[in-house]
Amino acid sequence: MHLAIVGALTLVLTLFVLHYTTKDDRCYILINGHSAFTNCPASPDLAKVISQLKPHNHG
């Protein structure tokens, strides 16, 4: 169950990154391990994705 949730979240984040990196304004989100950076303007969609990024433990 946990892997399904992680897989679904990964897919959503990948699609979100592709959506924003293909726009003409070069908005992007870089996700590296447990950190992320974006130059995207604030939006309700961006806030929704960021709210799903929660610290977690692999142990």
Curated annotation (Swiss-Prot):
Keywords, ordered alphabetically: Host endoplasmic reticulum, Host membrane, Membrane, Transmembrane, Transmembrane helix, Transport, Viral movement protein
Disulfide bonds: none
Lumenal side: 1-3
Side of membrane Cytoplasmic, spans: 22-59
Membrane-traversing stretches: 4-21
GO biological process: transport of virus in host, cell to cell
Coiled-coil intervals: none
GO CC annotations, alphabetized: host cell endoplasmic reticulum membrane; membrane
Listed Pfam families: TGBp3
Subcellular location: Host endoplasmic reticulum membrane
Signal peptide: none
Further comment found in the protein's record: TGBp1, TGBp2 and TGBp3 seem to act together for cell-to-cell propagation. TGBp1 is the main movement protein that physically cross the plasmodesma with the viral genome. TGBp2 and TGBp3 would facilitate TGBp1 function.
Homology family: Belongs to the Tymovirales TGBp3 protein family.
Function comment: Plays a role in viral cell-to-cell propagation, by facilitating genome transport to neighboring plant cells through plasmosdesmata. May induce the formation of granular vesicles derived from the Endoplasmic reticulum, which align on actin filaments.
UniProt name for this protein: Movement protein TGBp3
Organism per entry: Clover yellow mosaic virus (CYMV)
